[in-house]
Amino acid sequence: MPRPFGSPFRPDKPLGERPQVRPGSKPPLRVLATTLWEYPSQHYDAFVNEKGEVVKSKFGGRTAGSGGAMQGHKEYVGASPSWVIWQCLMRYTREGDSVLDPMCGSGTTLDVCTDVGRKGIGFDLAPTRPDIQQGDARVIKLPDASVDFVFIDPPYSTHVDYSDDPRCIGKLDASVEPQKKVEHYYDAMDRVIAEIHRVLKPKRYMGLYVSDSFRKQKGTVGGVFMPIGFELFAMMQKRMRAIDIISVVRHNQKLDRGNWRKAAEEGNFFLRGFNYLFLMRKD
């Protein structure tokens, strides 16, 4: 399968064998070739560019505290893995392309764009820094067909308290039945996806990073499972063409906590071990 737009990612130097994934290590990022993605950290220190050269991140030591690189901010709960964004940009964009993140959080996407020479555009209901514009992803303040790529990591129902803004989609419960007077999580996300389709240029791509969700609930045997990934994928397919589905391994310290594992075993439910990355194209 040819790379989109004749992407120049053809390293002059051989990539060699895939580095072993070891907890705590941060090997330079390289473009991954399978639909199972794994990296031992949320953030990267360096990456291999289009010429096969190892390039250090411009954000080394800025917020990490230990001298390692940190794209976005370490204190932001629910931050996107910067290495996943890097993989998307290296495959589906070129230098100088515009990249939109309509739920920009702590600005991770903008930092990755800076590293690889893309023009980052970020909106958020509660901006955390000056280069993120205030805005609702359900009404993106951009012209039609104006951006080259969109990355979005939306709330997975109510699992994280992102802000005090009552409009926040993270306050909408994906497990409840829709009500006439209250916007439902899936209705809100359908509006977001419609806006992404509107602002994305034809023949360009988007990536949506999301997880299903599970919540224990009194009176419900086995708790409540929310197949958020499947629901959002179905919404996107109504407007765009599916390119692929990536399974991203989650390296979350909470998954290794004995009490969490014990609760999952005794309660007969599963801890979330992976996220989806849905890749779509606007035809």
Give the label of every model feature segment.
Residues 1-283:
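Class I S-adenosyl-L-methionine-dependent methyltransferase catalytic core
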